[in-house]
Regions:
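C-terminal beta-signal and adjacent terminal beta-strands/loops
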Residues: 7, 69-77, 95-144
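Asparagine-centered polar/low-complexity signal
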Residues: 44, 80, 91, 109-112
């Protein structure tokens, strides 16, 4: 599976006029600036490989899955002064199936990529939410 996207989203009519405390007008023109929170590029590459095991095997089926998700550049403000560059995370999963039971071993952000998941400004301060670090897990499933 392969998906990619390019977005060119800019302001076309966004001008703000505010007044200073002394009454002097300040005009800010955002025309041509990128719209915040919209990644310029997104990318997803994924694949799956399944092995049907022999009747003598303990497992009925083994499935390997991997995908790479990427996004960027993402601007966080209308001024386009804070942004996240293009980044990607690699995820994988291995499923071991035995009849109606399955055990899965998985990892998210396997390359431990450091990235900003979200950013906002309030009261003249910027706050950034970091993306999740590398995670590992095991899932157990039983169908009735």
């Amino acid at each position: 599976m392969y998906k990619r996207q390019y977005t060119y989203a800019t302001f076309t009519d966004y001008v703000i006029t505010e007044e200073k405390k002394d009454g002097t007008p300040i005009t800010t023109d955002y025309n041509g600036k990128y719209v915040p929170f919209v990644p310029k590029h997104t990318l997803n590459i994924g694949g799956e490989y399944a092995i049907t095991c022999s009747p003598r095997s303990i497992f009925d089926r083994v499935v390997f899955q991997a995908n790479y998700n990427a996004a960027g550049r993402i601007y966080w403000t209308e001024q386009n002064d804070v942004s996240q560059s293009f980044y990607g995370t690699l995820n994988w999963r291995t499923n071991l199936e035995i009849g109606d039971a399955m055990i899965s071993f998985w990892a998210r952000n396997f390359l431990n990529k450091d990235y900003a998941a979200f950013y906002f400004e309030t009261m003249n301060k910027g706050f950034m939410q970091k993306g999740r670090p590398m995670q590992f897990g095991v899932d157990l499933r039983c169908r009735f």
